[in-house]
Amino acid sequence: MSDAVFREISDTQTPQGILAIVRMPKYDLSDLLQGDHTHLLILESVQDPGNLGTMVRTGEGAGITGIIMNKTTVDLFNPKTIRSTMGSIYRVPYLITEHLPDLLDELHKENIRLYAAHLKGDTYYDAFDFTGACGFLIGNEGNGLSDEIAECADCYLKIPMEGKVESLNAAVSAALLMYECKRQRGEHNENMV
């Protein structure tokens, strides 16, 4: 491939001259479920590729068993998303669904408890028990969760904040919840920082 063609298809200013063709993996819901150990991140219409990539990377670090997202979430294979994952995109199972409420019903049938950080939450997130199978619902950066998806949650929780801040960045909220789950489960390994 000529340098000119390579520069044309690359999305960076100074490409490194490396090109790879990889097969996109296909996952089923069963690939994300691990009984009582199930720990899911469930995304509705997240739009920022950097946020999505950060959530995938942080999710791997926190030991999630998979990520579920609806079709209106930014493309998981957006170049900025891929770079933000720092390779985690190739190790964290994911599922993209046409109709998120139906999939959330399936999760309820599997006894997976769903939590949403929501303005209606009146109990701090660290007061909940995340030691069983669970999933965290994270919504769009500008609008949060839609009413339809928020109503699928078993519990609303809140994250304490000072000052006049009304909410946190979606990736930050997701990180707090995923790591609280990891902490409660006592999941530590030699790679802890």
Predicted regions and their residues:
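Active-site/ligand-binding-proximal alpha/beta "capping" segment
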Residues: Y115-K164
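Short secondary-structure boundary/capping segments
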Residues: I9-T12, S30-Q34, M86, D126-F128, ...
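Arg/Lys-rich RNA-binding interfaces used to dock onto structured RNA substrates
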Residues: M1-D48, A116, K182, E190-V193
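Short secondary-structure transition/capping segments
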Residues: D31, P79-T81, D126-D129, A170
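Structured adenosyl-cofactor binding patch, chiefly the S-adenosyl-L-methionine
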Residues: G17, G61-A62, L76-I89, D147-V193
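RNA substrate-binding interface of SAM-dependent RNA methyltransferases
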Residues: A4, L29-G121
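Short, charged, surface-exposed secondary-structure boundary motifs
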Residues: I9-S10, E106, Y125, S167-A171
